[in-house]
Amino acid sequence: VESLGGKFLTVEGSENLETEGGYAKETSDEFKKKQEELLSETLKKIDIVICTALIPGKKAPIIIKDTMISEMQSGSIIYDLAAIQGGNTSYTEVDKIIVQGGVKIMGEMNILNKLPISASALYAKNLFNFVSNLLDKKTGKININLEDEIIEKTLIK
């Protein structure tokens, strides 16, 4: 998220919100109030939201309230990865795009099955670019330029 310019929202005085398995767990009413205030103000200013809050064995918590969605900018997108368990908005529907007040709510059921193809293509592209960097462009022969930052950082010394 951060490598793409996104930011995680952190509620001040956060409790430990994860189980050992990395899932969200139930939070206190005080935390929920702080979270709602932070989300409400933040959502008015941003274009893309990615929701992932899941609680094992339970319906996903509704963390983006209807009133928050109504105050978002038209054209904004909520990408709800918790759709399989009901979603983090009340509008989320599995494998559907719902438009509510100009905001698109995308309820992706199984994003993980779609990632391997993209990840493989990205890895192949990165590997190709790295190996291409080892070649002299004029002669086509291997030329390990130790002054190239990428090559220098990948050498085992």
Residues of each region from the PLM?
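Glycine-rich phosphate/diphosphate-binding loop of Rossmann-like nucleotide-binding domains
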Residues: 1-42
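ADP-ribose/adenylate-binding Rossmann-like module
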Residues: 48-106
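Conserved active-site and cofactor/substrate-binding residues in soluble primary-metabolism enzymes
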Residues: 3, 30, 34-45, 63-67, ...
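Adenosine-phosphate binding glycine-rich loop
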Residues: 89-157
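Residues at the C-termini of beta-strands that transition into short coil/loop
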Residues: 12, 82, 109
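Short gly/pro/ser/thr-enriched loop/turn and capping motifs at secondary-structure boundaries
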Residues: 16-18, 84-88, 112-114
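Glycine- and other small-residue-rich loops at beta-strand/loop junctions that grip anionic moieties
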Residues: 28, 53-57, 116
